[in-house]
């Protein structure tokens, strides 16, 4: 891959002390202490699975929390001001978990309208849905909840392939540069990450009966398939699929094997629908993916929840942002804080 200059913004989880903690020689058995990757810089807001959109010279940050709050800042380092909430009551989607606390939002601006795709689910379950809400401005005005775009393990069209094998969480959005057709990416574990075309109004699938879904990533030879949280970006002439690989959180009962925690990986293709390959030309559909950022310095653990802000012009870098656990404080994922790090050359 050609060299691309990325400015990365990261989100650090601040921990309220809770066992278990590795000590002494146990540290190197749990996470990487290498200093070959840079540490992030402070950004001053709590967030997990952050989502950031730029509009009218400001950054707007959305995060999973009750009623899905969003914040505004003139700079990625803050200070961040609470603007409002996407919801003032539970989602209109029925029979799914977290209806009052949607997960993993992705907000985009399209033709003068803001669309917030959100997740309803419970941890470790396929009984999930991705919904969408809209507004015309990010000034705190009311949003309209349009309900589910896709549902899995129960709900409308959940028996249609591939909804009968996938997990409807972690939505992201991309538009084909040539055709201007818009696509929704989704998926977590089970059969990993998928994509389908959206209707012209971006509120539903283009064809619910025959959704024309394609698989973007897959781990074929292992029982566990820990890929999720995908994001797709375009950097001429390639589309890039970024995703989290490994275990994200809930380490109170123990840690995964070293290197099996979250890391950020990527593949690329000239076609928005793939197939995607990594730096070594391995297919993402065959377990490939170049590691971009992973646990490091004995402080950064399990980075993931990735998103990309495009550069404002050809001379500015794209921004890759994410969260991680700050191991100098602890290992639970109760509170998090965004940070930025310096520029790095990525292949």
Explain the meaning of each model-derived region.
Residues 1-20:
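Fungal secretory targeting signals
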Residues 18-347:
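Carbohydrate-active catalytic/glycan-binding domains of CAZyme proteins
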């Amino acid at each position: 891959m050609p060299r691309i200059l990325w400015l990365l913004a990261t989100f650090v989880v601040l921990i309220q002390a809770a066992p278990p903690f590795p000590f002494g020689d146990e540290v190197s058995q749990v996470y990487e202490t290498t200093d070959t990757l840079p540490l992030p810089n402070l950004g001053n807001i709590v967030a997990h699975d952050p989502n950031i959109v730029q509009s009218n010279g400001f950054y707007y940050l959305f995060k999973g929390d009750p009623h899905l709050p969003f914040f505004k800042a003139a700079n990625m380092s803050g200070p961040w001001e609470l603007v409002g909430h996407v919801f003032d009551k539970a989602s209109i989607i029925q029979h799914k978990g977290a209806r009052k606390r949607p997960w993993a939002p992705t907000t985009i601006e399209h033709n003068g309208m803001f669309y917030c795709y959100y997740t309803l689910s419970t941890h470790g379950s396929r009984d999930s849905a991705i919904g969408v809400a809209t507004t015309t401005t990010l000034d705190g005005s009311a949003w309209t909840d349009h309900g589910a775009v896709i549902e899995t393990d129960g709900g409308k069209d959940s028996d249609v392939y591939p909804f009968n094998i996938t997990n409807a969480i972690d939505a992201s959005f991309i538009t084909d540069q040539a055709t201007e057709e818009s696509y929704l990416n989704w998926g977590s574990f089970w059969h990993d990450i998928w994509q389908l075309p959206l209707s012209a109004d971006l509120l539903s699938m283009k064809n619910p009966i025959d959704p024309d879904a394609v698989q973007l990533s897959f781990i074929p030879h292992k029982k566990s398939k820990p890929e999720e949280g995908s994001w797709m970006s375009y950097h001429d002439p390639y589309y890039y699929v970024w995703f989290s690989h490994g275990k994200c959180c809930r380490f109170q009962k123990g840690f995964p094997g070293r290197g099996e925690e979250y890391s950020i990986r990527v593949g690329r293709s000239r076609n928005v629908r793939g197939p995607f390959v990594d730096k070594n030309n391995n297919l993402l559909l065959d377990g490939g993916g170049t590691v971009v950022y992973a646990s490091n310095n004995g402080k950064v653990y399990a980075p993931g929840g990735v998103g990309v802000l495009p550069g404002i012009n050809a001379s500015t870098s794209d921004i890759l942002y994410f969260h991680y656990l700050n191991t100098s404080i602890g290992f639970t994922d109760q509170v998090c804080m965004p940070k930025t790090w310096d520029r790095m050359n990525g292949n």
